[in-house]
């Protein structure tokens, strides 16, 4: 698939088939995560792959946005590795967001679907999955083959014009 086509056609999948995701495809998604850019190339991303039915059931205790996917990845960053800027601002969450974008584009290219889930019980997720103290969970990616009746949502093609989201040189009053 051409890159521009991939960008336009990718959509949030919230209906998954029961078909298991092949190991080869999981490996390709994880390779996309590995090569994604991060601040100062510190690579603080830490990814937990969840496909065992018992662990997927535990995930349901942490969020209602699991969409019954046959695979999920919990994306965290290691705060002992994450770069901090000169104002001591943590870059880990931005790094993980970039990593997730690479992963979502790759998995869509592989015929899979996903959506970003940022709404979860943080403490319960840490407890259920024994997440180390120095790891910060940022998001969950439910992943799988889209169900046949899955289509882009009604807002998928509704985009603001460039003029509504971009300014040049400085912002003016009222923007």
Regions found by a protein language model. Give the residues of each.
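Acidic, surface-exposed loops and disordered segments
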Residues: 1-175
């Amino acid at each position: 698939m051409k890159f521009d086509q991939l960008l336009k056609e990718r959509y949030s999948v919230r209906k998954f088939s029961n078909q298991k995701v092949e190991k080869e495809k999981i490996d390709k998604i994880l390779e996309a995560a590995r090569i994604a850019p991060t601040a100062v190339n510190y690579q603080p991303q830490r990814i937990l792959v969840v496909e065992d039915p018992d662990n997927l059931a535990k995930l349901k205790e942490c969020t209602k946005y699991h969409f019954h996917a046959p695979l999920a990845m919990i994306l965290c960053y290691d705060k002992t590795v994450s770069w901090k800027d000169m104002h001591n601002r943590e870059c880990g969450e931005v790094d993980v967001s970039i990593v997730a974008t690479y992963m979502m584009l790759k998995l869509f290219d592989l015929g899979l679907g996903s959506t970003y889930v940022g709404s979860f019980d943080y403490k319960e997720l840490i407890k259920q999955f024994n997440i180390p103290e120095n790891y910060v969970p940022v998001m969950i990616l439910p992943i799988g083959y889209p169900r046949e009746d899955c289509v882009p949502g009604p807002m998928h093609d509704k985009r603001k014009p460039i003029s509504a989201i971009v300014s040049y040189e400085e912002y003016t009053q009222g923007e």
